[in-house]
Amino acid sequence: PPPPPPQQFPQFHVRSGLQIKKNAIIDDYKVTSQVLGLGINGKVLQIFSKKTQEKFALKMLQDCPKARREVELHWRASQCPHIVRIVDVYENLYAGRKCLLIVMECLDGGELFSRIQDRGDQAFTEREASEIMKSIGEAIQYLHSINIAHRDVKPENLLYTSKRPKAILKLTDFGFAKETTSHNSLTTPCYTPYYVAPEVLGPEKYDKSCDMWSLGVIMYILLCGYPPFYSNHGLAISPGMKTRIRMGQYEFPNPEWSEVSEEVKMLIRNLLKTEPTQRMTITEFMNHPWIMQSTKVPQTPLHTSRVLKEDKERWEDVKEEMTSALATMRVDYEQIKIKKIEDASNPLLLKRRKKARALEAAALAH
């Protein structure tokens, strides 16, 4: 029999509908004032299940359509082993305001790069970098396969489940997540447009490509300890740095990169492409030998842990720069999408395109 066709994505089953509980959260959990972290939209507190005494994390959001969307998308993604799991969601009144209370598994292992920085003498290797990128890639692959772009993949949103060596790395904070299927797509049951500009059907590419850029930056830092784009003046994000990001100006300086193969540098180049539509997709990334066959990746010792230790006081700036770069990118891509859709529905442009295609077809016919 012929081999089965290759599947683009493993078939994931999406979690069944989210049931929001209306009873008071304090019926079921003991809420403490211990702050675990600050999410994009609010603090995260430590809480304990009254039934099992197990520890969980609680995120509080003021109820509004944006908060509902965050909860809904995070809930759908919550099946993935590399995404922080939502356990319960409550709608309660708090200080007279309607709030959504999200109970999540507690990730006690700290941030990705703190863990690498705190290593003793054993070197961090290229193979470990590949394994880490694979687990982050699995989270993104899951999201993209169910048409969600996270749009805020950055170091502080990557946390370990525990301090143990075998801990699992998970992606958190869905405050900027976005559904990428265009519901108002141009194809209706009785009308399939004969020709549609690819930019009208492909705006979701932009949102997803934001995640791919993040993968490139994180992979770069994993391999050397510093980011590809940084501001020279110690400002959070300088005009010069914005230009470098836009122009894709970065290097692979020695000694940190001298032992890293050309193939790996090429993978980073394909993730950091300045034109979002040319960036590698998550499927291509997951199929790359460096990711797919991480057991074959050489155990080259890297400079990462030493550089992170030496630049410890710069790390807050690095995080701020990435936060800022992602914010700029989200705004830019929204504007590009709007402009492309306007261009695509501009009758004069459409006429010119039609003419050009007719000429092209005629030329091919000869």
Curated annotation (Swiss-Prot):
Chain positions found as Phosphoserine: S238, S294
Activity regulation summary: Activated following phosphorylation by p38-alpha/MAPK14 following various stresses. Inhibited following sumoylation. Specifically inhibited by pyrrolopyridine inhibitors.
Major subcellular location class: cytoplasm
Cross-link Glycyl lysine isopeptide (Lys-Gly) (interchain with G-Cter in SUMO) residue location(s): K319
Molecular function (Gene Ontology), one example: protein serine kinase activity
A GO biological process held by the record: 3'-UTR-mediated mRNA stabilization
Binding site for staurosporine: E105, C106, L107
Short sequence motif named Bipartite nuclear localization signal 2, residue ranges: 351-355
Stretches for region p38 MAPK-binding site: 332-356
Protein known as: MAP kinase-activated protein kinase 2
Role summary: Stress-activated serine/threonine-protein kinase involved in cytokine production, endocytosis, reorganization of the cytoskeleton, cell migration, cell cycle control, chromatin remodeling, DNA damage response and transcriptional regulation. Following stress, it is phosphorylated and activated by MAP kinase p38-alpha/MAPK14, leading to phosphorylation of substrates. Phosphorylates serine in the peptide sequence, Hyd-X-R-X(2)-S, where Hyd is a large hydrophobic residue.
Family annotation (SUPFAM superfamilies): Protein kinase-like (PK-like)
Family: Belongs to the protein kinase superfamily. CAMK Ser/Thr protein kinase family.
Organism: Oryctolagus cuniculus (Rabbit)
Subcellular location: Cytoplasm; Nucleus
Phosphoprotein keyword on record: yes
Catalyzed reaction equations: L-seryl-[protein] + ATP = O-phospho-L-seryl-[protein] + ADP + H(+); L-threonyl-[protein] + ATP = O-phospho-L-threonyl-[protein] + ADP + H(+)
Region (Autoinhibitory helix): 294-330
Keyword set, alphabetical order: ATP-binding, Cytoplasm, DNA damage, Isopeptide bond, Kinase, Nucleotide-binding, Nucleus, Phosphoprotein, Serine/threonine-protein kinase, Transferase, Ubl conjugation
Active site: D152 (proton acceptor)
Domain spans labelled Protein kinase: 30-291
EC number, UniProt record: 2.7.11.1
Record PTM: Sumoylation inhibits the protein kinase activity.
Highest taxon listed in the record's lineage: Eukaryota
Enzyme class: transferase
One cellular component (GO) term of this entry: nucleus
Positions occupied by motif Bipartite nuclear localization signal 1: 337-340
